[in-house]
UniProtKB/Swiss-Prot annotation:
Gene from which this protein is expressed: dys
Pathway: Protein modification; eIF5A hypusination
Pfam families xrefs: DS (PF01916)
Name this protein carries in UniProt: Probable deoxyhypusine synthase
EC number: 2.5.1.46
Length: 312
């Protein structure tokens, strides 16, 4: 059997926009190639730039698995630089951001490592990212137990997005998504906030602390932001609840003006994750005259390319 130390040698590292400066003209290369998937990258870059320039409400929507990778730091930097002013994501994003902010280290691994062996070695596997037991559950539990009593001491009811700001306020890691959102006053909307370690620990602590999370306040906020905006756009990475919650709320003001989907899901099974923007038009979630594109590919490749193009 492989030694645990041999598997946990190379940590995953966060990147920032500064790491992408030398690639700021890379989309021009894809424009020359153009064929097949390159067209999506070129169009996605153009729409993203126009969205950031013209839309006053700009959604960054992504799934939690990406926060276990080096994209975590890039998401934080995109928030810091003001490219996006609202985030919609899933419960695991909070787990991974807290774990990595408070000492948890994730490691480079492989999709093909024996999972029974990993369990015996007390290592979780997330795709090809290895997460030692001690870098995940216990870290999150300790953080919630440490900070939640002081956060809820004088507030017995709090919205989820304000609760996340409170945790972000207590983070010193410059690559933290929660910290960046707190610093920039960007709300993080997590409709499935109870789905994960963070949510489970909130439930456990609620049995000892007298507090409630008011998710209706999160809905009120997103409603107010959408109805007060002139134009809205979204970079939607992955599918599931974070994708749907983003496009769902935009239907009530005739839909998004801009939409960039990055996905590996297909539409043949009727899934929300695989649905293209044109289907959302039929639901009033994206405007018929909106500028939109679907880019098929791994987000860990596509997102850095699009982010780099913002620097050109």
């Amino acid at each position: 059997m492989i030694n645990r130390e041999d598997l946990l040698k190379n940590p995953v590292e966060d990147i920032t926009l500064s790491d992408l400066k030398k690639y700021n003209d890379i989309v021009s290369v894809f424009d020359k190639i153009y064929g097949f998937s390159s067209e999506g990258i070129v169009n996605g870059s153009k729409i993203l730039k126009e969205m950031i320039k013209n839309a006053d409400l700009r959604f960054l929507s992504f799934t939690a698995n990406l926060v276990s990778t080096g994209l975590r730091g890039l998401f934080a930097d995109l928030i810091k630089k003001g490219y996006f002013n609202i985030v919609v994501t899933t419960g695991g994003t909070i787990d991974h951001d807290l774990a990595r902010s408070f000492g948890g280290v994730y490691y480079k691994g492989s999709f093909d490592i024996d999972d029974t062996m990993l369990k015996d070695l007390e290592i979780h596997r997330l795709g090809n990212v290895l997460v030692p037991f001690e870098s995940y559950g216990k870290v999150i539990e300790d953080v919630v137990r440490k900070f939640l009593p002081e956060i809820t001491k004088d507030r017995k009811e709090i919205s989820a997005y304000e609760l996340l700001w409170e945790f972000g306020k207590r983070i010193t890691d410059s690559n933290s998504i929660l910290r960046a959102a707190y610093d920039k006053n960007v709300p993080i909307i997590v409709p499935g906030i109870l789905d994960g370690s963070f949510g489970t620990n909130l439930f456990i602590q609620s049995q000892f602390l007298n507090f409630r999370i008011n998710l209706f306040e999160d809905m009120r906020l997103i409603k107010d932001l959408i109805f007060s905006s002139k134009k809205s756009g979204a970079l939607i990475i992955g599918g599931g609840i974070s994708k749907h919650h983003t496009i769902w709320w935009n239907q009530f003001k005739d839909g998004l003006n801009y939409a960039i989907y990055i996905t590996t899901a297909q539409e043949y099974d009727g899934s929300l994750s695989g649905a293209k923007p044109r289907e959302a038009i039929s639901w009033n979630k994206i405007r018929p005259d909106a500028k939109h594109v679907t880019i098929y590919g791994d987000a860990t490749i596509i997102v850095p390319i699009l982010a780099a193009s913002l620097l050109s």
